Amino acid sequence: MSEIVDIYAREILDSRGNPTVEVEVFLESGAMGRAAVPSGASTGEREALEMRDGDAARYLGKGVLKAVDNVNNVIAAELLGWESTEQTALDQKLIELDGTEFKSTLGANAMLGVSLACAKASAEELGLSLYQYLGGPNGRELPLPMLNILNGGAHADNNVDIQEFMVMPAGADSFKEALRMGAEIFHALKSVLKKRGYNTAVGDEGGFAPDLKSNEEALEVIMEAIKAAGYKPGEDVLLALDVAASELYADGKYNLANEAQPLKTAAELTDFYADLVDRYPIISIEDGMAENDWDGWKILTDKLGKRIQIVGDDLFVTNTKIFKEGIDKGIANSILIKLNQIGTLTETLEAIEMAKRAGYTAVVSHRSGETEDTTIADLVVATNAGQIKTGSACRTDRVCKYNQLLRIEDQLGEAACFNGKDVFYNLR
């Protein structure tokens, strides 16, 4: 009864008003799975290809009708009659159909939509939630959220070099409590910014992007907000940064335009981070070096890898081949997981499993262009990854993931677990 009888894709809009792919997979039993594909703003050079039409007369060239056509005509013709529960075989067939390293024939957006919709249809067929279908009885760990509450860098027009400032309510006893703490800090930050005369409009991911004077001021207003919300920095709440250092890198140096000494070598940038870690309760730094500066990554990992989580996003792009090379070279100690960077569910699960075997942490992440699709909420619980990065406590395209996690926590009941600070198991 899990035989695939129809596959249909359409062009829909993401949270930034850009087209993306939505796929529906229908089974013989009448079950249906639907998945919408996210889209990144700042992307790694080695990410799987997001296929766009390039037709300037439609959506400024960002249409996805080619990818939609690939689903409706190429992929559907091959997969009709397959059992949707054969996820690994289905994903392997998609990879073979595409035949390229970076999914450039069919488009990772076409392939991922089909891959996820098949999994959702199978879960529906079996009467299971997606996290239950993917994780079985062992999938029960609710994640510690990274709430992106303040933006700089490429995500904002201000004097802050670092792209994302996040709070992690690691002192909470449950996901529900962690989310409440994060939301309260978000509102407290709004009040702090207003009091200082700053704009409180939010960006793509729901974080504030005021015209702050420096990286230091960004950290200071967040510390003030944590205290104003009634929490203790370093005890109840930890900080995480996404530097997006590839955006700052040119000619072998990093340009932090708003620092006293703007141009920094990898060693000097590492010292800059070490100083921040000494003075603020920072537990995680993502993309602290440029994706191609592997020597810089090694310097950073050697100096801070025992103290904080060092996350590779653009560095690894959820690609097990690249990730294995990083593990072998002792680079970073964590991987950011983005489904559309690699293009199939199976390859995503393999990356998470590889991280665990190597003693790395895995942080499941959204993209800046999101939809109402909540797949990553189920994925993070199914895999017991322990951490999720899906924006601020603002904007429905972000909050829908948090709300799905609240539902999952309720559904699990006494079986649910939440590890708080212990998610950083490789720092103990």
UniProtKB/Swiss-Prot annotation:
One of its GO terms (biological process) is glycolytic process. It holds the Pfam family Enolase_C. Pathway: Carbohydrate degradation; glycolysis; pyruvate from D-glyceraldehyde 3-phosphate: step 4/5. It is found in: Cytoplasm; Secreted; Cell surface. The keyword Secreted applies. It is an enzyme of class 4 (lyase). Its main location: cytoplasm. GO terms for molecular function: magnesium ion binding; phosphopyruvate hydratase activity. Binds a second Mg(2+) ion via substrate during catalysis. Its cofactor is Mg(2+). GO terms for cellular component: cell surface; extracellular region; phosphopyruvate hydratase complex. It catalyses: (2R)-2-phosphoglycerate = phosphoenolpyruvate + H2O. SUPFAM superfamilies: Enolase C-terminal domain-like, Enolase N-terminal domain-like. HAMAP family: Enolase. This is Enolase. The gene is eno.
